[in-house]
Amino acid sequence: VKSMKIVSLKRLGEIETSLINNYPDLEFYFFKNAVDIPTELKDELEILIGYDSGVDKNFINACPNLKWISWYATGVNNLPLDVIKERNIILTNTRGIQAKQVSEFVLSFILDDYKKMRTSYVNQVNKVYDSKLTGKRLSDEKVLILGTGSLAQQTVKLLKPFELEIIGISKSGHHKDGFDNIYTIEDLESHLNKADIIINTLPETQETYHLLSERHFKIMNDKCLFINVGRGTIIEEKILIKVLSHNLIRHAYLDVFENEPLDANNELYKLDNVTITAHITGNDKNIKSDATKLFERNLDDFLNKNDVIENRVDLYKGY
């Protein structure tokens, strides 16, 4: 009997040895890129541990025995979901694992803004000592979070001690712990102007693509803080630039963009009411080990039942 072949598109350091030791009957192969995998291995591999832009339609078609992709990231929008669905390939992601790190970034963005840390830093650089500078308090502020998944829920946990009012917007409008209220996407517009802070955590799907338009930003309170840690495609880039340059909102913290990486002459770099991070909020030293623990739990299920449950992506919804 040939043993099952598992290919990782990530080098996992010492984790590689422990995987090989924990599963002596399986064959593990580790590569840096999808293009490095030899054709004969593509023919035989059954499980792919991935995070690589090379996993496209052609790649999947070249792997006739592929049964499960364990994606070491949350967003799966760059994968050819239609082919994966057609072939009945199982897809899992790392949602929830990155939520701790991303939610801490969201909290730091809010505090950075409300406590005017940026102004203090600019003052320091210019040797200006301004003892009248006054930070804003978070208590009683109203927060609206687009999406109520694991990232939003973890963010709510961190924000709770600050005594804010937190509203969620989701497809179903179903109640989730920690939120004061949750409404459906249809109700979004009636809640936008009440929010002091708006946080997007939505994944990219057909429904969320360019979900926000200029109209939404016109409804928002002009003192509003907008944070995007979901996907950049929630709003068309040229509309985002227009909205910010016309000061329809006070400030934006953006970690994701419609076109990544940002081009050096992108207009967003010229605006003073934007704080940019380079899609780094999910970077985490612990991600490989946490994601591999999840992979091992799922692998045990796969070996026993030929199926996995935890963090399975609904291929019809795209998350």
Each language-model region and where it sits:
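Phosphate-coordination loops involved in phosphoryl transfer and adenosine-cofactor binding
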Residues: 3, 139-142, 223
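An N-terminal-biased, well-structured beta-alpha scaffold segment characteristic
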Residues: 2-92, 213-215
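A short, aliphatic-rich alpha-helical micro-motif
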Residues: 41-42, 60-63, 138, 191-193, ...
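Rossmann-like adenosine-cofactor binding region
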Residues: 173-267
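C-terminal helix-to-coil terminal segments
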Residues: 19, 92-105, 119, 260-319
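Phosphate-binding beta-alpha-beta segment of Rossmann-like dinucleotide-binding domains, i.e.
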Residues: 89, 94-142
